[in-house]
Amino acid sequence: MSRDLRLLRTPEELRLQSERWRAAGLSVGLVPTMGALHEGHRSLVRRARAECDRVVASIFVNPTQFGPGEDLSRYPRSLEGDLAVLAEEGADAAFVPAVEAMYPEGAVTTVGLRGPLTEGFEGAARPGHFDGVATVVAKLLVAARPDTAYFGEKDAQQLAVVTRLAADLDTGARIVPCPLVRDADGLALSSRNAYLSPEERHQALAIPAGLAAAARAFAAGERDADRLVALVRDRLERSPRLAVEYVAVVDPDTFAELAEAARGCRIVVAGRMPSARLIDTLRLGFDAPPAVAVDATGAGEAAQRSNPAPGAAEWSRPCSVS
């Protein structure tokens, strides 16, 4: 459903628009993005559209979440196309601020979370990344005052950070996790996939193939985290161009690494191709094994069916860590 899209350029414009909606008794949904929108982003807007009276999506390549040597300068930007996507999906407004509007001269306040949630995995691989994420999300929540905000599960650690931030700061916003979306070949959708060469993309399919192997093993009764991780690594090691950064089974809320898997825990993966860094995740017992058309060795591994494996009804209790 296409509709007129209001363009907002400053936090003050966003705040005033949200106040008008709320004064009229309308619920507000926020979809934060960095642009280069794909089907995963579309799914977030659709979810917001279905649940909220008004939807605003932000398009902002946030410089504070990029570290030295990362891809800030070359991150894909396609504003005209992104605005068309938002209009097609029925968003009511797009918040497209300049860097100077979000971080005016003299601003010295940042937001950060301390502790294990932000120290491992992405926090270790990208120092300062989550401080940048937390700061920009806090600013968006303050300006938009949404009833709900929608985040994809692919960035699972970011989702956990944002959920904790929203609760700790008493923002009143409900953080809604939305399922990861995969391309037809099984690769998790990401704006950075545009960096991949055809050969790199082919080898990157080892990531969803590894997750599929672990999901099937879990469905068959495997609970030892080391053995599940080994199944994933076995697939990844078939891709000579993929440098593995981490594979782990974690609690989805705290990101504590687990020795024993249970239903609802996540397997998280990160690896680096010469042209792009890739992350992926799967919720054990909830997410169906990714359907992968061919493995990274070219050996023609049969496509994995997208239905849960036999035994799924007997998956164990939800994951929890005290």
Features from the language model and the residues they span:
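Nucleotidyltransferase catalytic core that binds NTPs
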Residues: 2-243, 248-254, 282-285, 300, ...
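An anion-binding catalytic pocket shared by soluble metabolic enzymes
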Residues: 278
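Conserved beta-loop-beta connector loops within the AMP-binding
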Residues: 257-263
